[in-house]
């Protein structure tokens, strides 16, 4: 982290006001840093399993009452995966900087500190029970949870994220000022009482900020460590969805990949794209009960499908036709991964309803041109014209118009493209040899 004293920090602010701002977003340093973070995380978790016991099985197991009880694993002391260095050179369990399953001092404290933050936020759910009575668009107690989370977040970050570089001490307050926006916006909207792919994107950005400034080192953390962080995040957000009946944010309904998530499928598909000698389930068997039961605790993709089974009933091909199509027409996990990445570019990073709530600071995710490093134009609209956060009767955080396959723009199934049209698995997350300008340079 050289020249940290020259970094300018600022509270992130809105820059995407309507769909016409999307082209500028795709020219921004922020956009390339998001893609870079996604790319390096994918490479890290390829071929890796989650250690058993990290994911809370009750959250994806159907019961008469879909709300997980408050005495499940989320409220126990941290249950970190034990060292598992089975084979020398195993990137899932052994760090690059050592031939032992150990983390550097900074990574050990910050890895555990990050899990402690998620554990505290889980306890806040226990302390904030849902209000009694029917609620059509989410339970208002969720706003109390958000208020508590926002009030405590600054202290949570400072208490659990440790600096091991003295030159960065003077910059830490500014760093936290930018960073905390992204974690605070990772758990849904307190106003709209919804959760969706934009909030999932915000958590990726939060992790990217820690990686960027070496507060999490991918050279020392293992693939299983990274998966554990995301697994704990996903368990927390699914508890929020279940306990507070959160609406899907900007969902395409049955014509979308999933009501709430996209990245979880990318990471899970990457887990099935690693060591060629490792036994993995065939793509077209992934929806079968034996495969779901076997892999739902160790693979994020399968775990996400298990969650769908918990919250939805009826024929799978009717309520989740996109996922059903993947497992009816694709035979290779490499094609599943590349297709999901292309879909992410279009349906998440390319959609205004999703990225309008992604804000930009001065250093972590700047609104500056990737090629020239100059500020991108800002076309700010009047507040009374673009106030998307007003608490009206919106359907799924959008306009209230019923979504059908005829009135939304859809991404063609990328896994069904001709071979000549396909790119390599990570083409959508590489920069043709360029690296994003990081805020500390």
UniProtKB/Swiss-Prot annotation:
PANTHER family (UniProt xref): SERINE/THREONINE-PROTEIN PHOSPHATASE 2A REGULATORY SUBUNIT B, SERINE_THREONINE-PROTEIN PHOSPHATASE 2A ACTIVATOR 1
Main location: cytoplasm
Gene Ontology CC: chromatin; cytoplasm; nucleus; protein phosphatase type 2A complex
Family: Belongs to the PTPA-type PPIase family.
CDD domains per record: PTPA
UniProt name for this protein: Serine/threonine-protein phosphatase 2A activator 1
Lineage of source species: Eukaryota, Fungi, Dikarya, Ascomycota, Saccharomycotina
MF terms (GO), sorted A to Z: peptidyl-prolyl cis-trans isomerase activity; protein tyrosine phosphatase activator activity
Localization, UniProt: Cytoplasm; Nucleus
Functional note: PPIases accelerate the folding of proteins. It catalyzes the cis-trans isomerization of proline imidic peptide bonds in oligopeptides. Acts as a regulatory subunit for PP2A-like phosphatases modulating their activity or substrate specificity, probably by inducing a conformational change in the catalytic subunit, a direct target of the PPIase. Can reactivate inactive phosphatase PP2A-phosphatase methylesterase complexes (PP2Ai) in presence of ATP and Mg(2+) by dissociating the inactive form from the complex.
Keyword Transmembrane helix: no
Domain of life: Eukaryota
EC number: 5.2.1.8
Organism the protein comes from: Debaryomyces hansenii (strain ATCC 36239 / CBS 767 / BCRC 21394 / JCM 1990 / NBRC 0083 / IGC 2968) (Yeast)
Keywords from the UniProt entry: Cytoplasm, Isomerase, Nucleus, Rotamase
Ranges of compositional bias, category Polar residues: 66-75, 421-432
Catalytic reaction equation(s): [protein]-peptidylproline (omega=180) = [protein]-peptidylproline (omega=0)
GO BP terms: autophagy; DNA repair; G1/S transition of mitotic cell cycle; mitotic spindle organization; regulation of transcription by RNA polymerase II
Pfam assignment, any one: PTPA
Residue span of region Disordered: 66-100, 421-441
